[in-house]
Amino acid sequence: MKKWCLVILALMLCGCSASTKTAETEAVKNDRPVLRTETGSEEKNFTVFAMDTVMQFQIYGGNDDVEEKVRGKIEELEDTLSVTKEGSPMWNLNEKKNENFAEEFANLMLQSLKLCKDTDGALDISAYPIVKAWGFTTGEHRIPDEEERKALVSRVDYRKIQVNGNTVSIEPDMMVDLGSVGKGYTAEVLANLMKEEGVTSALFSLGGNIQTVGTKSDGSDWFIGIRAAEEDRYLGGVSVTDKAVVTSGGYERYFTGDDGQVYWHIMDPKTGAPA
């Protein structure tokens, strides 16, 4: 994660998976005319639906089975990180309050807890009960009243998550979701896998995350367009090489309540309501 290049449209406090139409997906489409003019390594294009997100890939070079290996790795990561797939390690943690993880995922938990600390709890991976109560995990949206929100906030505190070796433990009323960091982690893992498989250049979108591998095949930087939050236009863009560009905003995943107010999926762990 140390190579990430962050471009923030809205303060990322905590959220669930991005919708299938994202600013980053649009950015990939916007860059495709440039990519089509490139020659050299063979181009591979494919799409994967996983983690509640449409993932789009453009890869140059690499072994013949690189697509198969990318798909397999995504499935492996989703099987571990999913909070809704019965029997997954994350599902087991939330149900049993104690779970033994593979070392790489125990380390991811530690890295996530460090992010929680660094943001003074603005990002809190234990805020899943809040996200769930508002219906963003099921699509059955509702507005919890003030009393319920207070009760939900009392269940949120990343400092109560214990990691001992590869074993993670939480309090009886807690639930954890790594959705706020999961796609960024997945992008990093996939980028490393592609390099191991001989990929010389790649651009791929995982919902709110765009990852680049190397430079474009002509040696120039990738240019990623950043869409305006509430308008069908681009604010500008960034030039990157071998980095990720990550955005999060409430303009893609939200609902309008009976009160006429718009409520988005980015939650404030301190209030139990959208940020």
Could you say what each language-model-derived stretch is?
Residues 4-8, 14-275:
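Mature catalytic core of soluble alpha/beta enzymes
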